[in-house]
Design a protein with these regions (language model features):
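PLP-dependent class I/II
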Residues: 2-4, 8-14, 19-32, 38-56, ...
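Basic nucleic-acid-binding alpha-helical/helix-turn surface characteristic of O6-alkylguanine DNA
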Residues: 59
Length: 401
């Protein structure tokens, strides 16, 4: 038979989803699995969004405009003003999730062989989107001991060469929960200006900042307006992962023109998803407050529990709803598989994402996992008990000297 493409062979497996068949099999055996592996919010979608879905009364489900409905884009402009992000409807392109926004940013701005600098650990799908676009990810290391803070400028400049085309950040960060400071954002701005790079900024977790520190959007950085592409999504903000609605936002008209060609090729973003997303913008302030308060409590529950567990260390995440934790294990991939295939405590086990899948540096993250705190607190507490029992029983446990 014909061979599979090099692109297909190079495409990485998702560290978040690759163990899913093992979880299905564990459940088939009657094991309860606590899903800490995926950022699927469990909190309710805004009632106004659900009501809009129920009230759809159409005789035809047509293509929507390739750029997305104007009424939705106009309403988004008002939403972003709350964060001091001033854009016009024409600056916004509605996409099939934030993922499509990232992919089209890469496709529109990068040539095959171009390089993107990304702090690691990084959201694993960035690597997949870069491969799809023929580009290459060049990672700059951050460390768990320093809370995954951004390295100094010199470390970036060591990676910059004639092929470097862009810097990609996620702020607040997935998978680490790190929040970039004003100094770090200014550092990135200066690099973008000095080397005339693109800045792709994934800001889908902006609503979840827990430290009292200010939210610094890439759109706030002066002097690089035409270099900046903002990625957004309703998935995490409204617990609407399934409607697949995101946005690509840029003041650069040439980028928008290029992106629109890809949008026209895929015809239209989801019609029904846009109806729900537009209605969800009417969610009351109490909705955002209640969701935020719940994640604050979950973060405390998880991080306190992890750091009380012998041999485990987690920095305190400043945003999003993830943390990367270091475990006393020889290999977190093996450990996560073992938890699903061979272990249970009183008929229960845990599912986590091996952090090595969020790194491109060989061997990095080998003893780390990403944990999403998207379970109710009593389930998080129970999952921590099960995790501790798993670590006690794991044959590959490694004790620090």
């Amino acid at each position: 038979m014909p061979e599979i493409s090099v692109r297909g062979l190079e495409m990485p497996e998702s560290p978040i989803r690759k163990l899913a068949p093992l979880a299905v099999e564990a459940k088939r055996r009657g094991i309860k699995v606590y899903h800490l592996n995926i950022g699927q919010p469990d909190l309710p979608t805004p009632q106004c969004g659900l009501d809009a879905l129920k009230k759809i009364d159409r005789t035809l489900l047509e293509y929507s405009p390739s750029q997305g409905y104007l009424s939705y884009r106009e309403k988004l402009c008002d939403f972003y003003k709350k964060f001091n992000i001033n854009v016009k409807p024409d600056d916004i392109i509605i996409t099939a999730g934030g993922s499509e926004a990232v992919l089209y940013s890469f496709m529109a701005c990068l040539n095959p062989g171009d390089e993107i600098i990304v702090p690691e650990p990084a959201y694993a799908n960035y690597m997949a989107f870069a491969i799809s676009a023929g580009a290459k990810i060049k990672t700059i290391a951050t460390s768990i001991e320093e809370g995954f803070a951004l390295p100094k400028v010199e470390k970036f400049e060591e990676l910059i060469n004639e092929k470097t085309r862009a810097i990609m950040i996620c702020n607040p960060n997935n998978p680490t929960g790190y929040l970039y400071t004003r100094r770090e954002m200014n550092q990135i701005r200066d690099l973008v200006k000095k080397y005339d790079l693109y800045l792709f900024s994934d800001e889908v977790y902006r609503e979840y900042i827990y430290t009292g520190s200010p939210y610094i959007s890439a759109m706030h950085l002066q002097g690089i307006e035409n270099n900046t592409v903002l990625i957004d999504s309703v998935s995490k903000r409204y617990s609407e992962c399934g409607i697949r609605i995101g946005a690509l936002i840029t003041k650069n008209e040439e980028i928008r023109k290029a992106v629109m060609k890809f949008c026209q090729a895929r015809l239209s973003p989801p019609l029904i998803g846009q109806i729900v997303a537009e209605a969800s913008l009417d969610a009351p302030a109490s909705y955002y407050r209640d969701v935020y308060d719940e994640y604050v409590e979950r973060r405390k529950c998880l991080i306190d529990g992890l750091n009380r567990t012998p041999g485990v260390y987690s920095p305190i995440p400043m945003g999003a709803f993830y943390t990367v934790a270091k475990l006393p294990v020889d290999d977190s991939d093996k450990f996560c598989r073992w938890c699903l295939e061979e272990f249970n405590y009183e008929g229960e086990t845990v599912m986590m994402a091996p952090a090595s899948g969020f790194y491109t540096t060989p061997g990095a993250g080998r003893n780390q996992v990403r944990i999403a705190y998207v379970l109710k607190r009593e389930d998080l507490q129970r999952a921590l008990v099960v995790l501790q029992k798993a670590l006690e029983a794991y044959p590959g446990r490694v004790e620090e000297e």
